[in-house]
């Protein structure tokens, strides 16, 4: 059984027992979070939401909070002696999907 959930402005396909990296959540490591915006549930029977499946939830356990690899942003304007170098590390939350309730 799998589900498609929406979190952090993104849609993520999840299965029970799967580890997923998602946009940062306000939860500490070891806490349980519930995703209620379930768009699709697949398996023996298929349920498609309009826009979300009524009564369906996905339960996950927060494994850790972290920050992704550093990327470098470099803006440059030719002939103007104008450049800007900036780094960015995107925060994420690592969760383990425990149960899909549909």
From Swiss-Prot:
GTP-binding as a keyword of this entry, yes or no, is no
Output a single Gene Ontology CC term carried by this record. ribosome
Q: Which UniProt keywords apply?
A: Ribonucleoprotein, Ribosomal protein, RNA-binding, rRNA-binding
Q: Name the job this protein performs.
A: This protein binds to 23S rRNA in the presence of protein L20.
Record's family? Belongs to the bacterial ribosomal protein bL21 family.
List the InterPro entries: bL21-like, bL21-like_sf, Ribosomal_bL21, Ribosomal_bL21_CS
Lineage, top-rank taxon, reads Bacteria
- Its recorded name reads Large ribosomal subunit protein bL21
MF annotations from Gene Ontology: rRNA binding; structural constituent of ribosome
Question: What is the name of the gene encoding this protein?
Answer: rplU
């Amino acid at each position: 059984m799998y589900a498609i959930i929406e979190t952090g402005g993104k849609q993520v396909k999840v299965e029970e027992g799967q580890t997923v990296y998602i946009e940062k959540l306000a939860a500490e490591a070891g806490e349980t979070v519930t995703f209620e915006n379930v768009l699709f549930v697949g398996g023996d029977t298929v349920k498609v939401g309009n826009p979300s499946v009524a009564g369906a939830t996905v339960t996950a356990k927060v494994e850790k909070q972290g920050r992704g690899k550093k990327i470098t942003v470099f803006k440059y304007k030719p002939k103007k002696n104008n450049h800007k170098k900036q780094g960015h590390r995107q925060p994420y939350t690592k969760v383990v999907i425990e149960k899909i309730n549909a």
